[in-house]
Amino acid sequence: MALKDYALEKEKVKKFLQEFYQDDELGKKQFKYGNQLVRLAHREQVALYVDLDDVAEDDPELVDSICENARRYAKLFADAVQELLPQYKEREVVNKDVLDVYIEHRLMMEQRSRDPGMVRSPQNQYPAELMRRFELYFQGPSSNKPRVIREVRADSVGKLVTVRGIVTRVSEVKPKMVVATYTCDQCGAETYQPIQSPTFMPLIMCPSQECQTNRSGGRLYLQTRGSRFIKFQEMKMQEHSDQVPVGNIPRSITVLVEGENTRIAQPGDHVSVTGIFLPILRTGFRQVVQGLLSETYLEAHRIVKMNKSEDDESGAGELTREELRQIAEEDFYEKLAASIAPEIYGHEDVKKALLLLLVGGVDQSPRGMKIRGNINICLMGDPGVAKSQLLSYIDRLAPRSQYTTGRGSSGVGLTAAVLRDSVSGELTLEGGALVLADQGVCCIDEFDKMAEADRTAIHEVMEQQTISIAKAGILTTLNARCSILAAANPAYGRYNPRRSLEQNIQLPAALLSRFDLLWLIQDRPDRDNDLRLAQHITYVHQHSRQPPSQFEPLDMKLMRRYIAMCREKQPMVPESLADYITAAYVEMRREAWASKDATYTSARTLLAILRLSTALARLRMVDVVEKEDVNEAIRLMEMSKDSLLGDKGQTARTQRPADVIFATVRELVSGGRSVRFSEAEQRCVSRGFTPAQFQAALDEYEELNVWQVNASRTRITFV
């Protein structure tokens, strides 16, 4: 391979920066990098991002050279920009910082006192890093496909690579010294020391000509005002779970972030990082201990937040007309719910509840008191009813989620752990699963197998949406604004209808009341249902997809984008519905007391109805909650309660819905002979019956001459 002429390469770079242009909408030339150089010269911009796709248009060979030897070419580009900046400077910089004033002052003093023929010593020259007031980063070419962390090996050292993963840990942003400036206590000369490695040995003896001649032995003192610092942050990145081969542990990589790239990513973010893969050069005793092995890191040039499993950058984007047509049909609510885990047979109401969990309600913060909008759901049931499959599907569908199991999780693993930082040696916090799932969903399987001490760590998260830490002198509060989806088995493996609810579930009331919906999925023998389920499972097993039907499930990417659009809406509950909701809640409390209901109905139940109602309004992309939303929320609440009552609650509803509707209407009459049609329908719908069932019961009892409905269908009168 022939040696490169880097002087010629620098000229190519200069030519590219000056001459590259793109045509705008009007057909005029827009000098992309020329305009940025003007802003850099006037301190209106700090970072210059060089898109290598632009370089490829001009010189494809130069792109290959940059990708192969990125560190050298980054310096080459920076030098070229530094030389070009004076040409683009049209006026004096207004916003000057301390270092500007310091350098200007030194240059002015030097011009006054210096002999024209005198040459400065190398240590006394201003280093390029001190004079350079901008940052330069490369944006990888589109042909450079993202790689898995475990595929970045020794052959990638020094090259520009793009990797994807999840951020597990982020350090505080601290100042990193780039140039150290010293002043001599004897002769007053200034010495500059550019720093390239993570550690450096400060200079002690003055190297100036005066001190050397006089042998005065002047000592150097660090002058922080004249030194240059840059923002520095360390980040740990781990492979996605789907990138890890079977039986392997997820690999992680250290990413060192500087300047404008800091504070972009948070723990739990899915990111794509373009950077230079380099070894860490240890010095002194550490090198002796380390031997021939070397740790590696990625010097970040560009960090992009990603959606969980999409190739494009984060952000939902507008839906096309065709996509909106797919969603906006008459039964879109049922269609969206059925698109959740279409391979799993049945569980229609459970899927509707999970859809509302993904959309979420609206957060309220009246005078600093926070009322959560996230919906928490617990699925409890017999083994083999697809609870874990539903959880894993939600984990894949949610843009941001964490999946964990009860026995494999400790309280610290869920909340936060105190670790010692490898660089600074300070104690730092590392977020657990609930912190990493902030603004997302945390799925906890085998919830009943968790130790009681670990389960109590979740109480604060489920209501206050925060985690308060008081460990090793660190007192802080972390955000954990996530919905919790838990799956658990009953206490004795299967649900025993002969035992009470408390004996079957064995979870504390404080925890159960924090779940908006607690759903019991039982595996009851039913010939027709079992036959359909068996046919469904065998088809899925043979063809690895759901059986053909008239219904076509929506694509996962489309659902994710639609849910992201729904979450932007902030619907409110109108005053006209306030009385209706309070009346429904009071009725639920009365019924629970009268029937000695095993489930606990508290003020949290009312908040759960409001959350479910606002989630339904979000799903319809409207700004005001309507009566139908409240009715559906109450219906889901009633269905979840009925599932907990087991056979007792199911007999009346499943065998004779008409009889239950008749009893409900008779309750409303209470001494009189007639009742308003709308009032009766509203009460029956709020108890979980559909308008069609109400109509069927009405017709049935009218034929039996038990009651009569007037011609305008506004009143029901008992005969």
UniProtKB/Swiss-Prot annotation:
Domain MCM: 332-538
Annotated coiled-coil segments of the chain: none
InterPro entries reported for this sequence: AAA+_ATPase, MCM, MCM7, MCM_CS, MCM_dom, MCM_lid, MCM_N, MCM_OB
Primary location group: nucleus
Binding site for ATP 1: 345, 384, 386-388, 489
The record's account of how the chain is modified after translation: O-glycosylated (O-GlcNAcylated), in a cell cycle-dependent manner. Ubiquitinated by ECS(LRR1) E3 ubiquitin-protein ligase complex when forks converge following formation of DNA interstrand cross-links. During mitosis, ubiquitinated by TRAIP when forks converge following formation of DNA interstrand cross-links. Short ubiquitin chains on MCM7 promote recruitment of DNA glycosylase NEIL3. If the interstrand cross-link cannot be cleaved by NEIL3, the ubiquitin chains continue to grow on MCM7, promoting the unloading of the CMG helicase complex by the VCP/p97 ATPase.
GO cellular component: chromatin; chromosome, telomeric region; CMG complex; MCM complex; membrane; nucleoplasm; nucleus
SUPFAM superfamilies: Nucleic acid-binding proteins (SSF50249), P-loop containing nucleoside triphosphate hydrolases (SSF52540)
Annotated compartments: Nucleus; Chromosome
SMART domains, sorted: AAA (SM00382), MCM (SM00350)
Region named Interaction with ATRIP: 577-719
Modified residues (Phosphoserine): 121, 314, 365, 500, 678
One biological process term in Gene Ontology: cellular response to xenobiotic stimulus
UniProt entry tagged with the keyword ATP-binding: yes
Extra facts: Early fractionation of eukaryotic MCM proteins yielded a variety of dimeric, trimeric and tetrameric complexes with unclear biological significance. Specifically a MCM467 subcomplex is shown to have in vitro helicase activity which is inhibited by the MCM2 subunit. The MCM2-7 hexamer is the proposed physiological active complex.
Motif, Arginine finger: chain positions: 513-516
Residues covered by region (Interaction with RAD17): 521-564
Name of this protein: DNA replication licensing factor MCM7
